[in-house]
Amino acid sequence: MQYNFKVEAFEGPLDLLLHLIHRYEIDIYNIPVAEITEQYLSYVHTMKELQLDVASEYLVMAATLLQIKSKMLLPKHEEDVLDNGDDFIDDPRQELMERLIEYKKYKQVATELKEREQERAQLYTRPPIDFTSLQQEEETNLPLDVTLYDMLAAFQKLMRRKKAKKPVTTRITRQEIPIEQRMTDILKQLEIQGGRQSFYDLFVDDEREIMVVTFLAVLELMKNQQIIIEQEHNFDEIFVSSYTKSA
């Protein structure tokens, strides 16, 4: 099965790092490089396993993290230590930390500008007959709360769960399902379930190839704004809803 899905349509490497910092409640001013590098590489590995079209920037960031990690493992000399003995003048994490803080500010400003733009759009005078349909259209185009990386984390968890339950002697029969067919199946399944269903319940088949196609179909439906992904709190169960249900 070959299917290329461009990751850039969702996020970038700095977004992934910010996601990990938020998900694991990491202090951005004191990043545990070994831990976050392991998590970052795990996500990139999953994206490559899914045959997503991973941008070169992700690999550059991976190399940067490994370089910082190796520097952090080097012995510290006395002249590198400040008078209080707690911090180091030449912290290998400094540049990355500054980039993350700057990028986080940029994202916050971009979000605020988008919200203001949506507010201004609602102030335009339109005939009353068209106002309701316009409002619904604006609501369906709001940004998704769940990111690609939340979805990858859920898929990793799902794969671990399926692997743990699967008998070692199980013989796998390879099946190839067109992603377009799986997208149609998911939309029909949502319709039967009243427009909303648990993300995990979409994966009724234990075969890895089918699970991958299902996950890619969900991403494509997200990108096409045919479904909404909802998660109330961090680490909570993820639900998939059709736009008609959420409107």
UniProtKB/Swiss-Prot annotation:
Subcellular location: Cytoplasm
InterPro entries per record: ScpA (IPR003768), ScpA-like_C (IPR023093)
Quaternary state and interactors: Component of a cohesin-like complex composed of ScpA, ScpB and the Smc homodimer, in which ScpA and ScpB bind to the head domain of Smc. The presence of the three proteins is required for the association of the complex with DNA.
Protein function: Participates in chromosomal partition during cell division. May act via the formation of a condensin-like complex containing Smc and ScpB that pull DNA away from mid-cell into both cell halves.
Organism the protein comes from: Bacillus cereus (strain AH820)
One GO cellular component term: cytoplasm
This protein's name: Segregation and condensation protein A
The UniProt record lists the keyword Nuclease: no
Family: Belongs to the ScpA family.
HAMAP family in alphabetical order: ScpA
